Structures are given as C-alpha cells and as structure tokens.
C-alpha cells in the first residue's frame, strides 16, 4: 500500500498578499469584479502547482475563500441573512462581502454578521445565523467551479467541505430561540446535492471537515453525526477530517460512521497511533497529521517517522499537515534577512509540503538518511545561545505570589483614581490606534528601508501624534491616546523591542477577510533591553492636560499572536513576557502616565478546546497579566481590552485579572456580552464597545445612545465607559471623526439626561 501526501488546505492570500490587494481595490471601486476573479484564479492555479512541485499527491480544492471558508459554506447552503439578501434571491460575490463587511444590497448600512475566532487559532470566521423554519438550497457553486478549474489543469484533487454538524455548531440562533441542531435534516439535502455533483466529475475522495469532533460536545450533538453521515454515504469516499486536538475521547462515535477514512491531528492531540490503528475499521484509511500546520518550525522527521512507521503496510495510510496550512506563512525561501542559523530552524507552508514528501518517500522505501539530514538543525538549536538566557530563567524562578498582587483592592484604588482624574459620567475614550494613513505607513517604510534618517522619522511620527491629540481634543474625548503611529502591528511592535523574538519579511497569515498579520517568532528567552513605549507616551501627555493612556499589548496576547517556541511551555513564555512588560509599566508610571492599558484580546481565544483543560490555562494566563500590572500604584488606573469574546464561562478569570477598567467588543452582539457581567455582578468598570470598527458604517447618535441605555440596564451607569469596539487603525479619518463625534455627542446627551 503506497503512502500518499496531501494537505488539508493552503494559504489563500498569495506570497505578496495579492488577494488582499485585489479585495481592497475592488471594495474601493478601483477595479472590476472580473479583475478580482482573475486574481483568485491565478492564485489558485499557482498554489496548486506549487504544492504539486513540492511533492503533494492529492491537492486540496475548496480551501480558497474570498473572505472566509465558513462564510463560503453559508453561501453554498443559501444561508444569507435577510438584511443582506438581493430582492430576487440571487447570490453573488457582493452578497458574500456584504455579510462580512456590513451593507445592504441598496448600499445602505446593515450590520455585518458576527465574527469570532476559528477554534483556538488566530483566524476569524463569519458566524452563520440561523432562524426557525429556515430553508436551504444550493445557491453558490464556487466549490464546483474550482473543482472544474483544477481538473482542467490536470491535477489529482481532493475537494474540501466543511461538515454539516460542525457548520451548525459554529453558528448562532437569531430571533426566536430554538435548537439549531434541528436544522440538520434541512441542510443535508444540499450536501447530498454537492456530493452528487462531485461524483459526476469523477472525484474519488472528499475531505469533509468536522473539527467539532475534537470538542467535549453535548451528547445530542455527538448523536447527530450518525444520521448525518448515513445520509451522506455512498456517493464518494469521505475522509472525515479533524484537527486542533485529538479524537480519542470521541472515537466510539467516529468509528460508527459510514466513512472511508479519518484524518487526525497528531501534533496537538494526544492520540496514540497504535491505539488508532487497533480501533479504526480495518478498511479505513488513516490520514496522519504529522506536520504542524500552525507553526513555522522545521519538523524532526526522524521523530515523525518513528511515530508512524509501525503501522506502515498494515492499513491504507496518508501523511498530511495537522490542519490547513492557512495558519502558516507561504514560503521560507524568500526570507533574505534571516540569518542562516535561525532560518535553518524554520519551515513555512511550501517547506512543510516538502517535509511531507520526504516523510512519504522514507516510509515507502525504509530509507531514512534524508530525514536525518533534514532534522540536523533541530539538534543544533537545542544548544544554541540564541535560545537560552540565564538571567531571564533566574528571574522567572524567583516569582512570588506578592508579584501578582496590587497594593490595595479595587474599591480603594477607584477612590484614588477618581480623585486624580476627575472624569465626568460616561467618560469617553478610544481603544488605542488611530487610522494608519498612507503617510504614516510611508514614513515607517522609508525609515525601515533606510531612505529616511532617525531624526526625520521621529519628527514625522511626533507630528502625527500631535495631530492625533489635536483631533481628540477637538472631538471632546475625555481620555486620550497617542494613536500608535509608530506601530505597525500591536504584537510585532513589542516583539521588535524585546529580546527573544525574530521577524520575517513575508511571513503573512490571514486574520480575517483582507486583514493579514505577520506574527513574530519566539526563538528564545524573552527580556526587555530598554523602555519601549515611554518616550512617545510621555511626549503625547506633554501636549494635553487630559490623561493620555499608555498602551501595552498583554503577555498572553503576545504569546497567542506569535509563533511560540516548542521547547518550553506556553506558561513559561507568557510569564517571561509579563516580567519584561512589568518593567514597562513601572517606567510609564514614573514618566507621569496615569492610565495604562494592557490589551488582552487573546485571553479567551487561547483557551484549550476541551473545557476540562481550561482551569490550568486560565490560572497561569491570569497570573501573567497580574504580574505585568501589579507593579502599578493605586492611583494608576489599569485598563484592559478584549474583543471577539464570549465571557460567561470565564467570568471568574476576567474578574481575577483585577483590571480597574475593561473595554470589550459588544456592538455586533447588540450588548449580549454584558449579560455575563451582569449575572456575575462584575465589580469593576466596563467600557462596552458602542460601534463596530470592522465596518465602514458610521453609527448615529441615536444608535449609540440606545446601546448605552441598554448597557445601563445591566451595569450601573457610574461604572460605564463609552468607547468603540476596537482600535481604529484600519479605518479612514473621515469616518473615524464622524463616528467619534456621534459617540461623544451620545455621551453628552446621557450626562444631561441624568
């Protein structure tokens, strides 16, 4: 039985972010729809050919998405929210963009669909909306068209579909409450139709993704898999595909299904290959996810070979990435600035395809010399001075319980802060960043390329900070920010100023829609060689009598939004970052900055997928935040910001952070998230986001007032702040001014109404 290679998916955006540029040009009205579609076709063709040349036997088709693959599935099923529907019921690419970005077919504003994290990754999906009695039909044939494209190019392919049970699990009920699982019988005919169309095209295998099978699902949801797959059986071979965790706890459910193969993530799960082999039906194919699709590290192929070799020849076997390579940068070969030693430790998506080919060849032949050669740099890394810092390890070992305790409880601190800042009721602020204009980006780029000297760069940044302060004072905001003109990305900026990180030139990965991020890579112990944010915060504060917030990205978020080391625990990395940023808090305070925001938007998304593993993670995650913040004096107000969050199941931990003020993203969920804070009787101050910064829509004064009144029904008004959902980096100045002016006006109206 010859072993084959395949990937579960490939990055969509292009090596030079071609998809992002084409999307944004189309949205701005600068290019035609046909030009956008052409870019998509070219990217797909290139990526299929690149994977094939790298040694992939079965190419994924259907992993490409114009915005998000869950949203693509919604369109496939005809699941379009009423507010985004065309009058004639037709569906096109503009429908898809309206759902993701927030527009009605008329061009009028309409709330975008909710967006949240894809399991525990840094990718976001558009949450499907379900209503009672909803109808489904095949309305969007993108998958079939792309299958035809790939077949016309002569490729051997494996279409990819998001499975029906996971699709329902990922969605939310809108309107009258009901059990969304009851819709399963209604969506299955569409899946049957799609599989029939694939069978007509001669497709042998379909990858059907059911990552919900790695979760601790309610029994009713586990029970739903059997009837669902009974309905889908018989037209093509189905590779039931799971990832991000192991499947052993749900294996009894899985082995009862009428599928022909199972993909398991052997990186992030604890599944034992021998046990899987023993328990799976003898005629099933096992797809072994041996190469990590979520990181940038070169794999120890000798270890992978040993992990799987015992079952070679005993059952049909494929080797694969653990999950889609969507979460990895595309190509290491274009990284020209990484030094040779560090570069030898990495593998990006194309190199991971090459790793799979090496592994396949060794497993098929029994010859392992190439694996040993490939894995040699990994042995060298274990002893590199770039990795270990004795001073950091010593400081980490010396942490005590006192290091994570503020001097006094919140009630005492709040009195000191009220006396210091004398803020009005409904105080207004923003989350941190202001629009990153072409001028700002050009300034940073010129400095980075050496076309601008340090003095001129600093003069330019200072001018943008000054303008941000002037704008905020003109708008009448109460607590100001410096606008972060000097920062490219909230994690990358800190990583650049901390020892232990390295950066890539083209290591882009998709975050959502057209947004891409270039995560730093943690290669060693982390420390702060010098202050990072103090100079610009101090300068901004010198321009105004109003308080200016110091802005830090928190330790758990820096960890979660970086590619972490694999040789130490995530807890170790988080606490090393916390100690480095603790020194930054002390320096900001000494420089006269009275309000310091420590953003932790990633705290919840870092949760393990299984609830039984949550407590240990939350314990060290909260401790890391507190180590970071606890050096602050009582009169220094510590803020934190979180977004894309569901809080009700971690409220104890949110409260345990002991931040004086928490700002959260709530507008897309119509203040639903505040239910958690009300039920918990959250004791500190809260800023519920009053408008969605991911949408270009400008909220009206009335809209914001209505949201704030709704918030005040749940949280005492004296503890409420007024702010947008998130930073304003991706917006333009005209819409930012208009939205903030309406926000400030709404706050003033509520003060007068008291």
From Swiss-Prot:
<dbReference type="Pfam" id="PF01717">
    <property type="entry name" value="Meth_synt_2"/>
</dbReference>
<dbReference type="Pfam" id="PF08267">
    <property type="entry name" value="Meth_synt_1"/>
</dbReference>
<feature type="binding site">
    <location>
        <position position="561"/>
    </location>
    <ligand>
        <name>5-methyltetrahydropteroyltri-L-glutamate</name>
    </ligand>
</feature>
<keyword id="KW-0862">Zinc</keyword>
<comment type="similarity">
    <text>Belongs to the vitamin-B12 independent methionine synthase family.</text>
</comment>
<feature type="binding site">
    <location>
        <position position="643"/>
    </location>
    <ligand>
        <name>Zn(2+)</name>
    </ligand>
</feature>
<feature type="binding site">
    <location>
        <position position="641"/>
    </location>
    <ligand>
        <name>Zn(2+)</name>
    </ligand>
</feature>
<feature type="binding site">
    <location>
        <position position="599"/>
    </location>
    <ligand>
        <name>L-methionine</name>
    </ligand>
</feature>
<keyword id="KW-0808">Transferase</keyword>
<feature type="binding site">
    <location>
        <begin position="515"/>
        <end position="516"/>
    </location>
    <ligand>
        <name>5-methyltetrahydropteroyltri-L-glutamate</name>
    </ligand>
</feature>
<comment type="function">
    <text>Catalyzes the transfer of a methyl group from 5-methyltetrahydrofolate to homocysteine resulting in methionine formation.</text>
</comment>
<feature type="binding site">
    <location>
        <position position="117"/>
    </location>
    <ligand>
        <name>5-methyltetrahydropteroyltri-L-glutamate</name>
    </ligand>
</feature>
<keyword id="KW-0479">Metal-binding</keyword>
<dbReference type="InterPro" id="IPR006276">
    <property type="entry name" value="Cobalamin-indep_Met_synthase"/>
</dbReference>
<feature type="binding site">
    <location>
        <position position="599"/>
    </location>
    <ligand>
        <name>L-homocysteine</name>
    </ligand>
</feature>
<dbReference type="GO" id="GO:0008270">
    <property type="term" value="F:zinc ion binding"/>
</dbReference>
<feature type="binding site">
    <location>
        <position position="605"/>
    </location>
    <ligand>
        <name>5-methyltetrahydropteroyltri-L-glutamate</name>
    </ligand>
</feature>
<feature type="binding site">
    <location>
        <position position="665"/>
    </location>
    <ligand>
        <name>Zn(2+)</name>
    </ligand>
</feature>
<keyword id="KW-0028">Amino-acid biosynthesis</keyword>
<dbReference type="GO" id="GO:0032259">
    <property type="term" value="P:methylation"/>
</dbReference>
<keyword id="KW-0489">Methyltransferase</keyword>
<keyword id="KW-0486">Methionine biosynthesis</keyword>
<dbReference type="GO" id="GO:0003871">
    <property type="term" value="F:5-methyltetrahydropteroyltriglutamate-homocysteine S-methyltransferase activity"/>
</dbReference>
<feature type="binding site">
    <location>
        <begin position="431"/>
        <end position="433"/>
    </location>
    <ligand>
        <name>L-homocysteine</name>
    </ligand>
</feature>
<feature type="binding site">
    <location>
        <begin position="431"/>
        <end position="433"/>
    </location>
    <ligand>
        <name>L-methionine</name>
    </ligand>
</feature>
<feature type="binding site">
    <location>
        <position position="726"/>
    </location>
    <ligand>
        <name>Zn(2+)</name>
    </ligand>
</feature>
<feature type="binding site">
    <location>
        <begin position="17"/>
        <end position="20"/>
    </location>
    <ligand>
        <name>5-methyltetrahydropteroyltri-L-glutamate</name>
    </ligand>
</feature>
<protein>
    <recommendedName>
        <fullName>5-methyltetrahydropteroyltriglutamate--homocysteine methyltransferase</fullName>
        <ecNumber>2.1.1.14</ecNumber>
    </recommendedName>
</protein>
<feature type="binding site">
    <location>
        <position position="484"/>
    </location>
    <ligand>
        <name>L-methionine</name>
    </ligand>
</feature>
<dbReference type="InterPro" id="IPR002629">
    <property type="entry name" value="Met_Synth_C/arc"/>
</dbReference>
<keyword id="KW-0677">Repeat</keyword>
<feature type="active site" description="Proton donor">
    <location>
        <position position="694"/>
    </location>
</feature>
<dbReference type="InterPro" id="IPR038071">
    <property type="entry name" value="UROD/MetE-like_sf"/>
</dbReference>
<dbReference type="GO" id="GO:0009086">
    <property type="term" value="P:methionine biosynthetic process"/>
</dbReference>
<feature type="binding site">
    <location>
        <position position="484"/>
    </location>
    <ligand>
        <name>L-homocysteine</name>
    </ligand>
</feature>
<comment type="pathway">
    <text>Amino-acid biosynthesis; L-methionine biosynthesis via de novo pathway; L-methionine from L-homocysteine (MetE route): step 1/1.</text>
</comment>
<dbReference type="InterPro" id="IPR013215">
    <property type="entry name" value="Cbl-indep_Met_Synth_N"/>
</dbReference>
């Amino acid at each position: 039985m010859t072993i084959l290679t395949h990937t579960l998916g490939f990055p969509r955006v292009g090596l030079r972010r071609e998809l992002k540029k084409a999307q944004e040009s189309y949205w701005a009205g600068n290019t035609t729809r046909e030009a956008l579609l052409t870019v998509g076709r070219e990217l797909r063709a290139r990526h299929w050919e690149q994977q094939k040349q790298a040694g992939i036997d079965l190419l994924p088709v259907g992993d490409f998405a114009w915005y998000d693959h869950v949203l693509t599935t919604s369109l496939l099923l005809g699941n379009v929210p009423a507010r985004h529907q065309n009058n004639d019921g037709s569906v096109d690419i503009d429908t898809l963009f309206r759902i993701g970005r927030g527009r009605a077919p008329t061009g009028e504003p309409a709330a975008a669909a909710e967006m949240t994290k894809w399991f525990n990754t840094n990718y976001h999906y558009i949450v499907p909306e379900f209503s009672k009695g909803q109808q489904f039909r095949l309305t969007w044939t993108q998958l079939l068209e792309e299958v035809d494209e790939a077949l016309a190019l002569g490729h051997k392919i494996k279409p990819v579909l998001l499975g029906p049970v996971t699709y329902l699990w990922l969605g939310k009920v809108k309107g009258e409450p009901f059990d969304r699982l009851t819709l399963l019988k209604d969506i299955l005919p569409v899946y049957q139709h799609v599989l029939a169309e694939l069978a007509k095209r001669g497709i042998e295998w379909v990858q059907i993704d059911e990552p919900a099978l790695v979760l601790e699902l309610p029994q009713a949801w586990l029970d739903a898999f059997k009837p669902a797959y009974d309905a889908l059986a018989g037209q093509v071979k189905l590779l039931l595909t799971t990832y991000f965790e192991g499947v052993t706890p749900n294996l009894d459910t899985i082995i009862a299904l009428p599928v022909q193969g199972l993909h398991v993530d052997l990186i992030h799960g604890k599944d034992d290959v021998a046990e899987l082999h023993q328990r799976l039906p003898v005629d099933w194919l096992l797809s072994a996810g041996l190469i990590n699709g979520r990181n940038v590290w070169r794999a120890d192929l000798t270890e992978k070979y040993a992990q799987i070799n015992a079952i070679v020849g005993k059952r049909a076997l494929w080797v694969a990435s653990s999950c889609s390579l969507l979460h990895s940068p595309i190509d290491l070969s274009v990284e020209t600035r990484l030094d040779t030693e560090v570069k030898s430790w990495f593998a990006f998506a194309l190199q991971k395809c090459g790793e799979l080919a090496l592994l396949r060849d060794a497993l098929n032949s029994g010859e392992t010399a190439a694996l040993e050669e490939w894995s040699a740099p990994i042995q060298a890394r274990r002893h590199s001075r770039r990795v270990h810092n004795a001073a950091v390890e010593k400081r980490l070992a010396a942490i005590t319980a006192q290091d994570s305790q503020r001097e006094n409880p919140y009630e005492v601190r709040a009195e000191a802060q009220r006396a210091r800042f004398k803020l009005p009721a409904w105080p207004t602020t923003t989350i941190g960043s202001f629009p990153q204009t072409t001028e700002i980006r050009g300034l940073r780029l010129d400095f980075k390329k050496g076309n601008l000297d340090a003095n001129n760069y600093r003069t330019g940044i200072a001018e943008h900070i000054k303008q941000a302060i002037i704008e905020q004072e003109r708008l009448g905001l109460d607590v100001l920010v410096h606008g972060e003109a000097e920062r490219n990305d909230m994690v990358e900026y800190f990583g650049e100023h901390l020892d232990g990180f390295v950066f890539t030139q083209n290591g882009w990965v998709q975050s959502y829609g057209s947004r891409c991020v270039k995560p730093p890579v943690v290669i060693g112990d982390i420390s702060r060689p010098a202050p990072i944010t103090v100079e610009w915060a101090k300068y901004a504060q010198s321009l105004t009598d109003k308080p200016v917030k110091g802005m830090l990205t928190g330790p758990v978020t820096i960890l979660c939004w970086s590619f972490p080391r694999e040789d130490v625990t995530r807890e170790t990395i988080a606490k090393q970052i916390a100690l480095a940023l603790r020194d930054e808090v002390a320096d900001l305070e000494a420089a006269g900055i009275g309000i310091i925001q420590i953003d932790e938007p990633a705290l919840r998304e870092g949760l393990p997928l299984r609830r039984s593993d949550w407590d240990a993670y939350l314990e060290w995650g909260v401790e890391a935040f507190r180590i970071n913040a606890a050096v602050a004096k009582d009169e220094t107000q510590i803020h934190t910001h979180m977004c894309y969050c569901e809080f009700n199941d971690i409220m104890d931990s949110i409260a345990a952070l002991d931040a004086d003020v928490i700002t959260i993203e709530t507008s897309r969920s119509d203040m639903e998230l505040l239910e958690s804070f009300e039920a918990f009787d959250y004791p500190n101050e809260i800023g519920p986001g009053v408008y969605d910064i991911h949408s270009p829509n400008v909220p009206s004064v009335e809209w914001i007032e209505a949201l704030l009144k709704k918030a005040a029904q749940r949280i005492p008004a004296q503890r409420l702040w007024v702010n947008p959902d998130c930073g304003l980096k991706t917006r333009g100045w005209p819409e930012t001014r208009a939205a903030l002016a309406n926000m400030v006006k709404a706050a003033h109206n509520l003060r007068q109404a008291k």
